[in-house]
């Protein structure tokens, strides 16, 4: 609940800055909707990120339980509805020895993971993202898109994460989804998403403003993981 409140605060700041443009001098259109400041530009997400589709692991290589030398396989279940990282969502693991040529799929802090498919009858997860806050623990699976911010105009992982979970952005992204048995997003759908580019100094100021919120979220997550691991260890000892 605390993390939900922190994320809501961060999203409110993002909306104020990059959707409503409240801190900046701007105009409105004939319907009263805010227009971006004159020195902002319109572009696409592709300029801000390096995109990679998740790896298609062979089912025979996956483990049902973790070992001392394995990666958690990051699947869509690791992304929360509404956005966020679900540490309890891991259902598969893979030995590190099987991943020696897959370094680019190993996740690092600041990576953003997007759900690329969903159920046609109940689209709830499609397009939502998680922001990775731990290094060398997860490796990304197929049906999850890996978005790595590249530093363009000082646009931070926080900004991309909040953008991709913003209701306005999601509505437009999902409009381009492909509908079959399931609803799917392609790489092109994602990287060609429209966005506004603020000047670099504004993006840097935004990152500085929201970083304390995300630091608190990461700290809370780390404590939750530690408590969970301790509880499991105690449970294992008691069951002997």
Regions found by a protein language model. Give the residues of each.
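A short glycine-rich beta-alpha junction/loop motif
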Residues: 137-145, 174-204
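Short, small-residue-rich loop/turn micro-motifs
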Residues: 17, 77-80, 133, 189
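Non-cytosolic juxtamembrane linkers/loops
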Residues: 150-155
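Non-catalytic DNA-recognition/assembly elements of restriction-modification systems
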Residues: 1-59, 192, 196, 200-240
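Short, well-ordered beta-strand micro-motif
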Residues: 75, 146-148
């Amino acid at each position: 609940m605390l993390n939900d409140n922190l994320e809501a605060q961060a999203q409110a700041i993002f909306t104020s800055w990059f959707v409503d443009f409240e801190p900046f001098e701007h105009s409105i259109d004939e319907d009263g909707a805010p227009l971006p400041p004159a020195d902002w530009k319109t572009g696409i997400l592709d300029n801000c990120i390096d995109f990679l589709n998740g790896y298609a692991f062979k089912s025979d290589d996956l483990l049902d339980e973790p070992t001392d030398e394995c990666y958690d396989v990051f699947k869509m279940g690791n992304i929360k509805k509404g956005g966020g990282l679900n540490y309890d969502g891991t259902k598969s693991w893979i030995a590190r020895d099987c991943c020696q040529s897959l370094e680019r799929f190993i996740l690092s802090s600041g990576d953003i993971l997007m759900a690329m498919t969903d159920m046609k009858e109940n689209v709830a997860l499609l397009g939502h993202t998680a922001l990775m806050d731990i290094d060398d623990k997860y490796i990304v699976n197929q049906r999850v898109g890996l978005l790595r911010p590249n530093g363009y105009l000082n646009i931070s992982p926080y900004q991309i994460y909040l953008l991709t979970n913003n209701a306005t952005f999601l509505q437009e992204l999902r409009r381009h989804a492909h509908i079959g048995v399931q609803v799917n997003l392609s790489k092109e759908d994602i990287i060609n998403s429209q966005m506004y580019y603020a000047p670099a100094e504004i993006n840097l100021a935004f990152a500085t403003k929201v970083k304390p919120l995300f630091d608190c979220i990461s700290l809370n997550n780390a404590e939750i993981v530690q408590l969970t691991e301790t509880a499991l260890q105690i449970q294992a000892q008691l069951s002997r």
